[in-house]
């Protein structure tokens, strides 16, 4: 009985293959799924092939097939890096607290943020102590409080992160100023103890 149709199914989409008489193969150009396969079992999309003859009998081969299954697995990588955003402090801010809580958010809408890649640097020095990473939809909200008071003056915080597909976000920075010293007031007139009429 002759083969009538051959179909390839992946990510819920079905594609019809065309017979190539010159090679004796069924072929099709199939677009990859639009989303990363990281969240799939084994981090790969599993496909299946269904061959149907003229009588309606069909044979299905999927990723669990011992011989051909590995050829039906597809790894799809996203190309968009995570998004980084500072919550506090804002750029150019003057802060009287020498140990401010640095807060920022890292999000990625596809393969997801790899929390092990989140890095904070204070004035170019990587923070090696632990900081808070709270899972939220699409990523993490993070907070870091310096263990040692920052000196008065300008400071720059930078943050970095990558997703599970290896896309690294461009480091984001914020510069602010610590100012813990109140202004000095000097009275120039009238002189102390002056009596006038």
Report residues per predicted region.
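Extracellular acidic, Ser/Thr/Pro-rich low-complexity tracts
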Residues: 1, 51-53, 78, 104-112, ...
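Solvent-exposed loop/turn segments flanking beta-strands in beta-repeat/beta-sandwich domains
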Residues: 1-10, 97, 108-122
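Aromatic sugar-binding surface patches on proteins
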Residues: 21-34, 135-144
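Surface-exposed, short loops/turns at beta-strand junctions within beta-sandwich domains
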Residues: 32-45, 147-154
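Short, solvent-exposed loop/turn segments at the edges of extracellular beta-sandwich modules
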Residues: 52-62, 162-167
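Flexible, low-complexity linkers/stalks enriched in Thr/Pro that connect modular domains
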Residues: 65-85, 172-186
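Short, solvent-exposed loop/linker segments at the N-terminal edge
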Residues: 92-98, 193-197
